[in-house]
Swiss-Prot record:
InterPro entries: Ribosomal_uS4 (IPR022801), Ribosomal_uS4_bac-type (IPR005709), Ribosomal_uS4_CS (IPR018079), Ribosomal_uS4_N (IPR001912), S4_RNA-bd (IPR002942), S4_RNA-bd_sf (IPR036986). Pfam families: Ribosomal_S4 (PF00163), S4 (PF01479). Residues 89-157 form the S4 RNA-binding domain. Transmembrane segments: none annotated. It comes from Agrostis stolonifera (Creeping bentgrass). This is Small ribosomal subunit protein uS4c. GO terms for molecular function: rRNA binding; structural constituent of ribosome. The keyword Glycosyltransferase does not apply. Part of the 30S ribosomal subunit. Contacts protein S5. The interaction surface between S4 and S5 is involved in control of translational fidelity. One of its GO terms (cellular component) is chloroplast. The gene is rps4. One of the primary rRNA binding proteins, it binds directly to 16S rRNA where it nucleates assembly of the body of the 30S subunit. The lineage of its organism: Eukaryota, Viridiplantae, Streptophyta, Embryophyta, Tracheophyta.
């Protein structure tokens, strides 16, 4: 299944706020159309909805998300928490959380077009996994800096998660550590996502 490129408002009406996909928020009462089913059908619908929220927020294909679930399942810690850590430490998401892009698709474009450096080297892979002490910067030219300047200027410093630091003058971000669960930027029940995939096998 390919990455979603359709109407974004349609998705947030159905799934609720997806800040990684769009800054728009659903009008009160317009999202999460409730269809009541009995027993197993209702439980399946809830698990599917949480999986879709995760997929669309981070801008993943079904295959990519499944691969992350498999990797997380091999860890000795909670599969759900490891899954969220893997997704949050992607380079495209780090750029988004730093405020260097307004959405994850926007951050992905910056990476694909070779505007972003990690520890002084160009990285053009959005799924690149960042680690503690990584330094994220733009290329040292006017065009690259101009692409992130307005986003950084308009971003709310109070929303910056504690595992990241941003130098707004140097257009430089720092990964301080692996994020804690409470800093995830999406309202999600990750256990239901893991449960969804465990029931597919």
């Amino acid at each position: 299944m390919s990455r979603y490129r359709g109407p974004r408002l349609k998705k947030i009406r159905r799934l609720g706020a997806l800040p990684g996909l769009t800054r728009k928020t659903p009008k009160s009462g317009s999202n999460l159309k409730k269809k009541f089913h009995s027993g197993k059908k209702e439980q399946y619908r809830i698990r599917l909805q949480e999986k879709q929220k995760l997929r669309f927020h981070y801008g993943l294909t079904e295959r990519q998300l499944l691969r992350y679930v498999h990797i997380a399942g091999k860890a000795k810690r909670s599969t759900g928490q490891v899954l969220l850590q893997l997704l949050e430490m992607r380079l495209d998401n780090i750029l988004f959380r730093l405020g260097m892009a307004s959405t994850i698709p926007g951050a992905r474009q910056l990476v694909n077009h070779r505007h972003i450096l990690v520890n002084g080297r160009i990285v053009n892979i959005p799924s690149f996994r960042c680690k503690p002490r990584d330094i994220i910067t733009t290329k040292d030219n006017q065009r690259s800096k101009g692409l992130v300047q307005n986003y950084i200027a308009s971003s709310d410093p109070g929303k910056l998660p504690k595992h990241l630091t941003i130098d707004t003058l140097e257009y430089k971000g720092l990964v301080n550590k692996i994020l804690d669960r409470k800093w995830v930027g999406l309202k999600i029940n990750e256990l239901l996502v893991v449960e969804y995939y465990s029931r597919q096998t």
